[in-house]
Regions:
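N-terminal glycine-rich FAD/FM-binding segment characteristic of electron-transfer flavoproteins
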Residues: 1-254
Length: 254
């Protein structure tokens, strides 16, 4: 079985700076694998047998130049890495991202696609579903467990009040939740071995992809201004204090 696990590179949260204008400055933010996609990579690694092949795939812009992240991905189980780097994909929204991934996936070849439930930045929860629609494949989201029985997959979906159990044949698309596993911490041997694994880098033209007319535009990302604390402390439980607390709450809600 050939498994492709797709991931996104996102800025390191602790390096993002909020400006006085309540916008976000990413200039000094290093790249990392989206936390939800670490679960997808781990799910692929746990599912695969010795006869299977795991490929990791991502599309994007300048963040893909980070060699440390490339080694991080390959140290977590995938046998090879595919990158589609193009300026048009720098800030691509879910539809364009999905179209680029689908084009690359068709070129690579696959049996099973595994995605995280969303990305660590936009968390749109759309890309895996859109890829399945573009490729006309069955898609199951909210996957909390995967078992393999020959060429059949037994999938669990943990819902609010139920756990669904679904039998599925490949090819298919799975979108896994963050509860499905605990991503591994790569060993030193795995990190050193990652440097010997193949990395395939393409441009948009290599997969016959071009940016479509946008149906939506990301105008900007702003941080809501923080509300100043009132520093009112009521330090007893007398009826008068309770009444005072109620009065403050009424003022705050009105």
């Amino acid at each position: 079985m050939k498994i492709i696990t797709c991931f996104k590179l996102v800025p390191e949260e602790q390096d993002i700076v909020v400006t006085p204008e309540y916008t976000l400055n990413f200039d000094n933010a290093d790249a990392k694998i989206s936390q939800f996609d670490l679960n997808a990579i781990e799910a692929a690694s746990q599912l695969a047998t010795d006869d299977d092949e795991i490929a990791a795939l991502t599309v994007g812009g300048s963040l893909l130049q980070n060699s440390k992240v490339r080694k991080d991905v390959l140290s977590r189980g995938p046998h090879s890495l595919y990158l589609v780097q193009d300026a048009q994909l720098e800030h691509a929204l879910p539809l364009d991202t999905a179209k680029a991934l689908a084009a690359a996936i068709e070129k690579i070849g696959f049996d099973l696609l595994i995605f995280g439930e969303g990305s660590g930045d936009l968390y749109a929860q759309q890309v895996g579903l859109l890829v399945g629609e573009i490729l006309q494949l069955p898609v199951i989201n909210a996957v909390s467990a995967i078992q393999r029985q020959g060429n059949t997959l037994v999938i669990e979906r943990t819902l609010e009040d139920d756990v669904e159990v679904i039998e599925l044949s490949v090819p298919a698309v799975l979108c896994v939740t963050s509860d499905i596993n605990v991503p591994r911490i790569p060993s030193m041997k795995a990190i050193l071995g990652a440097g010997k694994k193949p990395v395939n880098q393409w441009q948009a033209s290599d997969i016959d992809w071009s940016q479509s007319a946008p149906l939506a535009e990301l105008v900007g990302i702003r941080v809501p201004p923080q509300t100043e604390r009132k520093h009112i402390i009521i330090d007893n439980d007398s009826p008068e204090a309770v009444a005072e607390l109620a009065e403050h709450l009424k003022k705050a809600l009105n």
